Amino acid sequence: MRLYNTMTRTKEEFKPLKDKVVNMYVCGPTVYNYIHIGNARAFIVFDTVRRYLEYKGYTVNYVQNFTDIDDKIINRAKEENTTEKEIAERFIEEYFKDADALGIKRATVHPRATEHIDDIIEFIKILIDKGYAYVVDGNVYFETAKFKDYGKLSHKNIDELMAGARVEIDEKKKNPLDFALWKAQKPGEPAWDSPWGKGRPGWHIECSVMSTKYLGKTLDIHAGGPDLIFPHHENEIAQSEAAYDQPFSKYWMHIGYLNVNNEKMSKSKGNFFTVRELTEKYDPEVLRLFMLMAHYRSPINFSLDLLDQAKSAYERLSNAVVNLKHLANITKDRELSDEEKDLIVKFDEYKKQFEEAMDDDFNTADAISVLFEMAKTANANLSGNSSKKLVEYILEMFLKLSDVLGLSYKNAETEIEDEEILRLIEERQKARKEKNWKLADEIRDKLKERGIILEDTPEGVRWKRIR
């Protein structure tokens, strides 16, 4: 199994530090609003990575934090005349509603920054004691010039970073690239006691503290959105490696950017979509499938037209499941014919192709193509006369591989009940006996409209669902 490591810019053989255990940290949301589709892409992709690792037999310790104190949360609390805690609690709850709808599994731990203030203070003390941080007027800053590898993740040297840094001029800093580990209290803002006076933690330190607390000083995988490479992940590396003198993470994974109608998503352009507003109109699994139909590192363009295409694609998969479930109910248990044994071999090959796609840097786009091939082959070769063993084997495999992608087809329902189909077939047979060809054709057409194809054979009428 190989994955692309942002740090080395190459695909590497995946070998976790401990056999069959993966310690994985994903940067979670700042909880001041509903999550948007850019957030959702990251959470869906890394949930899928986790699911595939579990499918392969790994135990995955999956930690995803909540940033529950931040300027955006403070501003929203002021706007609504409420507390930061109330805003954070509300949007953590809303996050879980969206995540559950999208089939995103709960993390092993969902730590919150405000519950780790003591740990953060202890971590900052280590950095001060080792000479990597300095205190000015109740603020504590990390001194980037002291960390010789600063810029190694974004592949930039300090001079390049300085030239491109859009940093507020802060007279307190020794260097514009230095960043706050602890921020002195401002009037009206929440604050905690510390050796440097009342204040609150900086954003970057929170992730270093929470990831290492729950997963150890070196992680297997650290993952997030492309906008986090610099400065957030770069700063996490600097803090963590300065504190512990060992690599912070073995592998770094980042998704590609998501644009809307070929433009960067922004509220001012009116092309901003939250997960909530889309899942009110579309099955959440359609949005999930859309996100996985492109390779996770590729940029992705979002539009409602493209989402409609994903909806049609999802319906093809969903209808295959409906058809397979129906056949599992009506077929008889008997030994497999030679043709059916060949089909088993063919589906085992599909499973291998699916795994090969996922083993190659989690290529969900190719894996989904395999599911479509499976659906097509099942629809073309299975009927009410197939062996129950064969149908159940294919159904179980299809659902298991779909589950790796987080697709359960839970809303897939049979559009027409089996009893109704059999009743109409009987009616048609009666019409044929009476040579009432017009009525017989009308019944056939009526069933076809509802996704049922009839086939007249010497053994009798066979039927199957096509959607």
UniProtKB/Swiss-Prot annotation:
Localization annotation: Cytoplasm
Residues engaged in binding Zn(2+): C27, C207, H232, E236
Key words, A-Z: Aminoacyl-tRNA synthetase, ATP-binding, Cytoplasm, Ligase, Metal-binding, Nucleotide-binding, Protein biosynthesis, Zinc
Reaction(s) catalysed by this chain's protein: tRNA(Cys) + L-cysteine + ATP = L-cysteinyl-tRNA(Cys) + AMP + diphosphate
Positions of short motif 'KMSKS' region: 264-268
UniProt-listed Pfam families: CysS_C, DALR_2, tRNA-synt_1e
The UniProt record lists the keyword Transmembrane helix: no
Annotated family: Belongs to the class-I aminoacyl-tRNA synthetase family.
Superkingdom of this protein's organism: Bacteria
Major enzyme class: ligase
Lineage: Bacteria, Bacillati, Bacillota, Clostridia, Thermoanaerobacterales
One Gene Ontology cellular component: cytosol
Cofactor note: Binds 1 zinc ion per subunit.
Gene name linked to the record: cysS
Name the record gives this protein: Cysteine--tRNA ligase
InterPro entries in alphabetical order: Cys-tRNA-ligase (IPR015803), Cys-tRNA-synt_Ia_DALR (IPR015273), Cys-tRNA/MSH_ligase (IPR024909), CysS_C (IPR056411), Rossmann-like_a/b/a_fold (IPR014729), tRNA-synt_1_cat_dom (IPR032678), tRNAsynth_Ia_anticodon-bd (IPR009080)
Required cofactor(s): Zn(2+)
Disulfide bridge partners, by residue number: none
One Gene Ontology term from the biological process aspect of the record: cysteinyl-tRNA aminoacylation
E.C. no: 6.1.1.16
Annotated ATP binding sites: K267
Single annotated GO MF: ATP binding
Intervals of motif 'HIGH' region: 29-39
